[in-house]
Amino acid sequence: MSRADELYRQTCIDILENGFSDEGLEVRPHWADGIPAHTIKKFGVVNRYNLAEEFPIMTLRRTYWKSAIDELLWIWQKKSNRVCDLGSHVWDEWAGEDGTIGKAYGYQLGVKYQFNQGQEPMDQVDRVLYDLKHNPASRRILTNIYNFQDLHEMNLYPCAYSMTFNVTGNKLNAILNQRSQDMLTANNWNVVQYAALTHMMAQVSGLEVGEFVHVIADCHIYDRHIPAVKAMLEKDGFEAPKFVMDKSVDDFYAFTKDSFKMENYKFHEFKFDIPMAI
């Protein structure tokens, strides 16, 4: 089984056996039928992935990795908040009448700031790219899209909100901070996205990949997802596939979802419909 499978299994078992249930409490999320969507949660989950050893994609069920990377590029490369710029319909329900998700996610990464006196303003992504090449020893290479000033104009508050990059020797390490994580629908989706981002940032900066650390504040399983999660945990996973990235790309903005391959990706069938809490 892949390392991603192992950590997913450990996290889910810990939540189910030792987590806190908010059943009976007033909660914001609800199901499509109007019934409150309750969870079992653990606080402060930290999972570490050595990207130099294997790519962290799960095999207990299929992760649609190409769609996940397409979404990441929508946020980090296009810096867009328009759902029509995305190749899937994942975000359609959060789009307003103007076809955007408000000042969330990609919008925040596209805002330009005056970082240093005398330098031209640049956005957060370009600042990361600049520092990785020119200031790799810096401890300030990070992004943060949880902008309190704009929260009232976001159709969805950012869940994965901050990336910190750290260069150790010739290796690029990264930490993703996430305030909330739905384990069934989004955990490995997010892990795949930001592991791929770390690979991209490393390649265009002339670095090797190191460790990807995923820090989750509220890590939860929804009540109606529990049967599906338990069924997944009964399976034995497969070995991780081989992650292949186009080595000729040296410009972050030149990557596309077709710049990647997942060779020999084996996964178990998943026969459950997944209701979405909103």
Residue ranges and their predicted role:
Residues M1-I278:
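Terminal, non-catalytic protein-protein interaction segments that mediate quaternary/complex assembly
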